[in-house]
Amino acid sequence: MKSKLLLACTILFFCSSFLCGQNQSSKVANSVETNNGCIRHPWQGKRVGYLGDSITDPNCYGDKIKKYWDFLQEWLGITPYVYGISGRQWNDVPRQAEQLKKEHGGEVDAIVILMGTNDFNDGVPIGEWFTETEEQVMAARGQTQKLETRKKRTPIMDGSTYKGRINIGINRLKQLFPDKQIVLLTPLHRSLANFGETNVQ
C-alpha cells in the first residue's frame, strides 16, 4: 500500500511540474493560465492509455486499493483507458498497445507505461539497447560535404532480454501512435513480498 501511494505521489509530482507560482519564462507552451494565476496542466481532461501489470490492473485488489491512474483521474479529470494485467511483463506491451488502438483508435492523447517489476522477478536478462557500427556517409557542417566515418546505432529487438523487450514495445507504440506522448515509468523497487504459501517473491 505504501509503495503504491508513493508511486501515485511520484506520478502526481512528475505531472504537476506546472503548478501555481511559476514565473512567465517557465510556463509550458500547451498550458493555459487560469484567472487565479495558476497553470492548467496540459493533461487536464485528456484521454490517457495505461499499459502495465498488477500495479496498473484495475481488477487487481478490486476497490481496496486506489491505483495511480485513479489519482490522476480525480486530480486532472483524465479519462483512463486501462489495459494493465497482473503478472505481465514488457513482452506484453505490444499486445496491450494493439488492444488500445483497436478499441480507441487515435482518440488517445497520451500513453503511460509502468512495467518491468515482473521481468525482474522472473530473472529476465538485462541485455543491451543497441549494436554500434561505423559507416561511411556523406556529411557537411559549414563546409563542402565529404565522406566521413560515423557511428550508427541499431536497436536490438530481442524478446528474451529486458532492454530488447522495451525496444520492441516502444517500436510498436511508435508505429501505432506516432504523434502521441509516451511516458515510461521505471519499475518499483522490489523487496521480499510474502503473499502466501505459494506466492513468495
Give the residues covered by each predicted segment.
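Compositionally biased, intrinsically disordered low-complexity segments
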Residues: 1, 14-17, 31, 35, ...
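Bacterial Sec-dependent N-terminal signal peptides
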Residues: 1-25
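Alpha-helical transmembrane segments and their juxtamembrane interfaces
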Residues: 12-14, 63, 191
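Serine-esterase "nucleophile elbow" of acetyl-processing enzymes
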Residues: 21-86, 97-106
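Active-site-proximal beta-strand/loop segments in catalytic clefts of secreted hydrolases
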Residues: 51-54, 83-88, 114-117, 185-189
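Alpha-helical cap/lid subdomain in secreted, periplasmic
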Residues: 75, 96-201
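N-terminal beta-loop-helix "entrance" segment that forms/cooperates
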Residues: 91-92
